[in-house]
Amino acid sequence: MSDTSDLVDGKWQRLPPVPEGMSKSQWKKQWRRQMYEAKKEEYAEVRKEKRKRAKENRRKKIQEYIDRGEEVPAELKREPRVNRDQVASGINIILDCAFDDLMNDKEIVSTSNQITRAYSANRRASQYANITVTSFNKRLKERFDKALDDCNYPQWQNFKFVSDEKLITEGDKSKMVYLTADTEEQLDTLEPGMTYIVGGIVDKNRHKLLCYNKAKELGIPTRRLPIGEYIKIEGRKVLTTTHVIQLMLKYCESRDWKESFESVIPSRKLDPVKEKEQQQQQQQQQQ
């Protein structure tokens, strides 16, 4: 298509004339934002309808398992919104959101959604973590202050937001671990008193080594979750921020990575080959 057109809602639309003093790329970004604001209510209705259909589909699937006399998979079971019997896990988690300028508007929305899901997971966990979102500023903060203003994020328990990244740059590096898929060293366990940093970025793998290089520059040790042990993923083994948080919370409860992955990750992504190898090893040890 020509440079005077832009893709909006899956359709090519003619771009209005570029205002004086503004580049074409700047105008495209601003125009997309204006189009989004104009159709925000429509988008909200579409999301509401999708959630309704997903809820109905979930109920049908659960009923099918019940009718067959089979156990309902954990991924279909809905946990209570708040776990009243929570205890502290002793670990700290930092969501490093210093990558605002590297994401487009849709990726900012996705990042904000993952943060809200991480908060929900922390509320439901049997052992909660102290979670802090650093570099909470620019478009991400604007998103929470405007579009998500009803979530009351400043009052979230065990979940803080700070505008700078002093916790990362000035904290005790000997008690920090930056989690990144780009390192060779694997994370074996989670230790109370340690702080685990997770990159708060949605970039579709555009910025490889981003978190790894930042950690190295700051002198922070890097580790990767044992993803390859249990998940079948092509290329770089990268999980969403939400999944990383959920896995860590589940591990604090079970102290078992295998059980944690099976509980958090959809079964279609789990690696049946690795599972079979482990079963064979266990059988050989028992003989």
Curated annotation (Swiss-Prot):
The active site is at residue 203. Its main location: cytoplasm. It catalyses: guanosine(9) in tRNA + S-adenosyl-L-methionine = N(1)-methylguanosine(9) in tRNA + S-adenosyl-L-homocysteine + H(+). Residues 268-278 have a biased composition (Basic and acidic residues). Belongs to the class IV-like SAM-binding methyltransferase superfamily. TRM10 family. One of its GO terms (molecular function) is tRNA (guanosine(9)-N1)-methyltransferase activity. S-adenosyl-L-methionine binds at residues 179-180, 199, 203-207, 211, 225, 237-239. Its EC number is 2.1.1.221. Residues 79-272 form the SAM-dependent MTase TRM10-type domain. Disulfide bonds: none annotated. Monomer. Pfam families: tRNA_m1G_MT (PF01746). GO terms for cellular component: cytoplasm; nucleus. It comes from Candida glabrata (strain ATCC 2001 / BCRC 20586 / JCM 3761 / NBRC 0622 / NRRL Y-65 / CBS 138) (Yeast). It is found in: Cytoplasm; Nucleus. This is tRNA (guanine(9)-N1)-methyltransferase. Residues 1-27, 268-287 are annotated as: Disordered. Keywords: Cytoplasm, Methyltransferase, Nucleus, S-adenosyl-L-methionine, Transferase, tRNA processing. S-adenosyl-L-methionine-dependent guanine N(1)-methyltransferase that catalyzes the formation of N(1)-methylguanine at position 9 (m1G9) in cytoplasmic tRNA. GO terms for biological process: tRNA N1-guanine methylation.
